Amino acid sequence: MAIELVTKFKGYVDEQFSTESKKSMLTNQDFDWTGAHTVKIYKATTAEMNDYDREGTGSNWSRYGKVQGINATTEEMTLTKDRSFTVATDALDADETQGVLGSASVLARQNREVVIPEVDAYTYGVMCADAGNKPAAVALTEENIYAEILKGNEALDDAEAPETDRVLVLKPSTYTLLKKCPDVVMETDIGNELRLKGVIGLLDGCKVLKIPANRLPADFGFMIAHPCATVAPTKLESFVVHHNPPGISGYLLEGRVCYDAFVLDNKAKAIYYQAQPAT
């Protein structure tokens, strides 16, 4: 007697793991690109201090010292990343896969697994490349990692970067080294608001973020940054669903994201990037 065994399909999708963006902890939105593709900001110089010539015996006509000029130059930020995607889903496929290929599911998956990781990786790459403090590459170990982090914070102190809201970025492997370091006492009693943003602790006054290695440069060791240094605008983020467009029975999904990241010249010293030797 032949018996046909039942096969069941569940409305569950084996989704890929993906991490939410932590970019907002490291960057700012201080400038508005609405109605413009390029934003220019001014950089101004200052004057040196002099000893006041109270007796008027100096060679300058002014007792205040030699009159100096002030220069004002511009810093230009032009958006360069204009990215897009398009995908079609058949009407029957959407109906017969228990919603797995529904337009809302497809767009959410694309944004979560492709768009956000790309924007993050680009932004972190710009920050590392344009950091104002980039010492020679060092092989990080559990014995030296804490000392290297202290050097980074010291560099930001010497650059007079703001002491509050600094962020220490680690990839999982360097975070493991840090946890093994006997000198480290990380403060983990932090508020729920910071935890929801991805902060896992506080170290030497820095909020500690752990970011997947695939969103960071290959030689990444760690980075200390203040959000004032990097502007990361997203000028356009458009996702459109067309129902039964010409030539397709189903849905045509289109997305476009225009974004970029810029490290400000006078604030680059608020980023310390420690690379590791290439392996």
Model-derived regions: residue spans:
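Sequence/fold signature of self-assembling virion shell proteins
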Residues: 2-25, 30-50, 73-81, 181-279
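Long, hydrophobic/aromatic-enriched structural stretches that serve as scaffold segments
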Residues: 67-104
